[in-house]
From Swiss-Prot:
Record's protein name: AAA-ATPase At4g25835
GO biological process, one term: response to stress
Reactions mediated catalytically: ATP + H2O = ADP + phosphate + H(+)
Family note: Belongs to the AAA ATPase family. BCS1 subfamily.
Cysteine disulfide links: none
Enzyme class: hydrolase
PANTHER family, sorted: BCS1 AAA-TYPE ATPASE
Stretches with biased composition (Basic and acidic residues): 497-506
UniProt feature coiled coil, ranges: none
Biased composition (Acidic residues): 487-496
Classification via InterPro entries: AAA+_ATPase (IPR003593), AAA_N_dom (IPR025753), ATPase_AAA_core (IPR003959), Mitochondrial_chaperone_BCS1 (IPR050747), P-loop_NTPase (IPR027417)
């Protein structure tokens, strides 16, 4: 054993002497050339190729590095031995990551690859316009040469898609509102945000189940059909108009849409917008996968002069009143035009962003300009009506835990008879049930009493839904009359609640 250690020490001494001799005899340029030659020789016979993905590319952040980091976080939680744990701002879950200089094996299309997380110390900077992190981070991807052309491009595309999905699932949705008077927030953005945690879903929405299913299918088709919009040359956007009496669930519908698609919401307050250019800047700062909401649009727009000639013979441009609201003098504030909004919903500016939904709400559809309602701007008109028997059953299930079989047939029959004639909103039914939610039987009894009293009052005032046309028909009839008046009395048929106008303001 002693002879072994003696021989090893002698060998190390000889190697050290040879190295010092080479350093003194051979110049650095020659040594570098020899080292480069050996590396080429090694690569020639190596069966692997390597790809480095650094955290910072020059002075810019490498998007691919962040995508790889997110993608591997879904695998290392199971396969890794030493992990790093992080939780980003606005994130709802903890993210797993590879520790420094650790590696993990991944498989894609039956091809095995190896990822290694490389962390090294960066050289000290004497001066730099942009300070760099002290550590230099990156991933190294090792793939067999025979598999490189087979999977590399598709594998990286898959990583980007997977990372976007993980980011969307982990990040809490946000509710944005435009800053007052066009001011900027601390990050220089015109939108202020808070976490969006509204519990409304399509399951809890008091609405006809058939209509809900149609809306859900339409939303799903929109989110999954990017190729359709590209093929047909249309901007990837969709518009929904929610109309009906107050308290019928228009805001809950918007929240259910956002929760169903996992989109952010931008609540655009038009009274804080001063001009068309400011409106354009606001809308350009919205992100994809978002819902842009303008509530009570009939209260923000002056449409009384639309297509009516002044004494000079010219047409008035409809204006959105901003600043202090509709009740103030127009001379005291700035105005934006209806065309400024329409140009962004389906004009040239509609392509500045993708996968966005515009939602307008109103209590009086007959007050809206036909140009705002035509197809291509508001693609789907959704009437939020008074409670029906099916929506009352949903509310009984939500607030009292009642299923249809829990109520006796007499109560169900009476509910079915009076609810349509009562003209009661889901908000009123919800309030009646919340007050007595600890006593379910009493809650149902008081709801029936309230429904009967409303029926008697409506019949006394001649407003019974049985004797008169429905609210939805009244809205369409009012809009039809407005349309006919603007076209010299010509009558046009309005089908499927989609209003068509021959006057194109865009």
């Amino acid at each position: 054993m002693k002879e072994y250690w003696t021989s090893l020490a002698s060998l190390l001494g000889v190697l050290a002497f040879c190295q010092s001799l080479m350093n003194s005899v051979f110049p650095p340029e020659l040594r570098f050339a020899i080292s480069k030659l050996f590396n080429k020789f090694f690569k020639l016979f190596s069966t692997f190729c390597y790809f480095d993905i650094t955290e910072i590319d020059g002075v810019n952040t490498n998007e691919l590095y962040n995508a790889v980091q997110l993608y591997l976080s879904s695998s290392v939680s199971i396969a890794g031995n030493r992990l790093s744990l992080t939780r980003a701002v606005n994130s709802s879950s903890v993210t797993f990551g590879l520790s420094n200089n650790d590696s993990i094996v991944d498989t894609f299309n039956s091809v095995t690859v190896v990822w290694e997380h490389i962390v090294t110390q960066r050289q000290t900077q004497t001066f730099a316009w942009r300070p760099m992190p002290e550590e230099k981070r990156g991933f190294t991807l090792r793939i067999k040469k025979k598999d490189k052309n087979l999977i590399l491009d598709s594998y990286l595309d898959y990583i980007m898609e997977k990372a976007n999905e993980i980011r969307r699932l982990n990040q809490d949705r946000l509710l944005y509102t435009n800053s007052r008077g066009g001011s900027l927030d601390s990050r220089g953005l015109p939108w202020e945000s808070v976490p969006f945690k509204h519990p409304s879903t399509f399951d809890t929405l008091a609405m006809d189940p058939v209509k809900k299913q149609q809306i859900m299918e339409d939303l799903k088709d929109f989110a999954e059909c990017q190729s359709f919009y590209e093929r047909t040359g249309r901007a990837w956007k969709r518009g929904y108009l929610l109309y009906g009496p107050p308290g019928t669930g228009k805001s809950s519908m918007i929240a259910a849409m956002a929760n169903y698609l996992r989109y952010d919401i931008y609540d655009l307050e038009l009274t804080e917008v001063k001009s068309n250019s400011e409106l354009r800047k606001l809308l350009m700062k919205t992100s994809s996968k978002s819902i842009i909401v303008i509530e009570d649009i009939d209260c923000s727009i002056n449409l009384t002069n639309r297509n009516k000639k002044q004494s000079t013979g010219s047409y008035n441009e409809p204006e959105m009143l901003t600043g202090s609201g509709l009740g103030d003098d127009l001379g005291d504030g700035n105005t934006i035009t209806l065309s400024g909004l329409l140009n962004f919903t389906d004009g040239l500016w509609s392509c500045c962003g993708s996968e966005r939904i515009f939602v307008f709400t109103t209590n009086h559809i007959e007050k809206l300009d036909p140009a705002l309602l035509r197809s291509g701007r508001m693609d789907m008109h959704i009437h939020m009506s008074y409670c029906t028997f099916s929506s009352v059953k949903i509310l009984l299930r939500n607030y009292l835990g009642f299923e249809e079989g829990d109520l006796n047939d007499v109560v169900l029959k009476e509910l079915a008879e009076v609810v349509d004639r009562a003209e009661i909103t889901p908000a009123d039914v919800s309030e009646a049930l919340i007050k007595n939610r600890r006593d379910k039987e009493r809650a149902v009894r008081e709801l029936l009493v309230d429904l009967r009293s409303r029926v008697e009052r409506n019949e006394k005032n001649g407003k019974s839904r049985v004797q008169n046309v429905s609210l939805e028909e009244q809205e369409n009839r009012a809009f039809d009359s407005l349309y006919a008046e603007e076209n010299g009395g010509e009558e046009e048929e309005i089908e499927d609640n989609i209003c068509k106008s021959s006057d194109d303001c865009s």
